[in-house]
Amino acid sequence: MKNDNELSEESYREEKDTHPRMDTDVVSARILTDVLISQKVGGMIISPGSRNTPLIVAASARENLKKWIVPDERSAAFMALGMAMVKKVPFALVCTSGTALYNYAPAVAEAYYQQVPLIAISADRPSEWIDQDDSQTLVQPGALSNIVKKSFNIPVVSATDNDKQWFVERVVNEAILLSMANTPGPVHINIQFSEPLGGTVRYSEQKVRKIEVIENSSPLPRHIMDMLGAELADKRIMLTAGFLPSSEKLQKAVSNLSRLGNVTIMAETLSNLHLHQEAYSIDLPITMLEEEESTTLRPDIVISIGGALVSRMLKTYLRKVKPQEHWTLGDTKIGTDTFQALTRHYEVEPAAFISALAGSIGHHRRKRGLQESEFKKGWTNLKEKAQRRHAKYVESSGWSELKALDDIFTRIPNDRNVFLSNGTVVRYAQLSTRRLPHLTLGCRGVSGIDGTNYAALGASLAYGGRTILVTGDLSFSYAPEIISSAYMTNKLSIIVINNGGGGIFRFVKSTKHLEIREKYFCAPPHLELQRQCENAGLPYYMANEERHINEKFETFLQTGGLFEIKVNPEESAEILNNYFILK
């Protein structure tokens, strides 16, 4: 494992080309690559192949384009996803023809539902050779159509066809701009090449046209915001925040809203909103609600920002009490009716809207002399009570996932990025969050467990500081080879909760009582993590009781490596189940 001092500019490990600067003689590949650079994409993750030879040659000739080589397309796509999540700019993926493209699908789907910009580029044979029993061919245009903002198809372009060269330039500009426009997301460019594929010419820098978009992030007109502020001044308001990229503007806006005397905040760990501690307390307070409180603390209006919520309890509660109004903002798709109570969607930039709304509500509350509402007091008291019970329960409980992770989350330094895997880990983070680290990430767009390792690796490469992946043994087993990756450095540390497979199946109602649960659902992967770390030269630590975390965790934070947390699966499940019957 390399240390972070061995990384090149901006903490990236890049492949340095040693051959002379020879460019591809395929004009469409040159134009595409030059437009990527002009639009300032974050870099290109290349999966080697034959049909994408022109793109690879073009990329290798351009020293101002960052490049990473990852042969497995599935891993490459998740690595690009992690990079784009941190950098908030598009990263390009390049693969060969055939099924290679479909290996991008899981990461592209995650990017689509998490609103992360990616440029998936697939090389293809000429259209006349599709479905002609030629090798490594299938119908590629539109292959990802349900999980991208738009698909583009570029035909074979000759060196003398100016109209088609203009078409390539325009299409690639459009694709990149679309990936970042309004709600960001992935796009797919399929580009056809005829043979020969490996022809070269001496590299010569060419100027390509760069198209720009002028954005407008203004809130609604002032008179409308004033009207909304007057309408909501005495209403019981709840703001829910799912996964979000970090944003200083949104942070400030939500902070201002949270200070109002008629507002309570339900912010999930992945919201990246650094607020007062009680804002993150969600599940336990809801389970502690008495029947009478369930009605008196019912919000009149719910305003939602961010992506899909982790908390099933919050969703169930709001579906049950049915707020009079539910508003979603511009980062949510029109028609997303999570609580079955949707009344309005504002196609606005959330930070600007919330900032203006908070100011307007505050103005009208002061004008009317309104004090802190019983609604706000009730939620604040309930959350504080839940936090005390959480601390008391964790302290008195035995060694378990809950106890280990509650301890670990309090020890993670503020300057670290944290990547959470799906299943139990992200839910434990919800229960134990008292403050947020620098940035919290996870694959919650579609909530699969398959790509977490490489997404975290990509995120670590894109961040100047250090990143910690917190994952379970089943999720980690999808790509344990990550610890031997050429891009693995001590910028990424890994914590694996070894609970004998999919621990969530010991908790959810649908599976926890099934006799076949362990074999068919939990499916223990039996990882030999210590041996794998030794083979890779990666520092290894292990804890199977509380004192081991006290003894080893600080050293782990300094050296990086892998920290395995071993717990008894049945005892951990029982402790978690009992947690939710606290009163």
Name each model feature, range by range:
Residues 2-23, 154, 317-424, 541-583:
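Phosphate/pyrophosphate-binding active-site segments
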Residues 29-33, 47-51, 55, 380-464:
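Active-site diphosphate/adenylate-binding microenvironment
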Residues 43, 87-95, 113-115, 122, ...:
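Structural signature of the thiamine diphosphate
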Residues 103, 241-327, 335, 435-463, ...:
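Glycine-rich, anion-gripping cofactor-binding loops and their flanking helix/strand elements
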Residues 121, 128-141, 428-583:
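Thiamine diphosphate
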